[in-house]
Amino acid sequence: MNPHVDDKRAVILIGHGSRAAGADDDMEKIAAGLREKSGGIVETCRMSGRGISFTKAFERCVGRGAEEIIVLPYFLHFGIHLREDIPEILRTAARRRPEIRLVLGRHLGYDDALVNLLAKRIGESEGLCDVRKITPAPIDRRMKDTPEEKQP
């Protein structure tokens, strides 16, 4: 498969984003893979307000000559961000830049490839230790409801 992305047609991956260091790395790796596969313009942005905003990613694509931008939601579930928030963000951008064709692609959702990936993860889990033997990482400690540290 060779996705058609070039100097006139760009892709923006839009994800939720996270405050946890390194949590967004996988989306960046996916974007890098798409860039390598297509040789075209591929940007990322996040809904969380951390990292690059959609507006910034959109303007980067336009600044590089894109006339069409495909926005691919990096989400598994068809929740509020996909039903309401992202379409509104795109409508705002389309009003601001009517000369740019703006397309909202499908979210990750269901795909047989995802079933195969989960089956692979089940296989990889064989031989891993029980969770009771894992020392909590600093972020895991925040999830405990103790008198010293309440859940956020």
Question: Which residues fall in each region the model found?
Answer:
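Active-site-proximal alpha-helix that buttresses catalytic centers in soluble enzyme cores
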Residues: 1-152
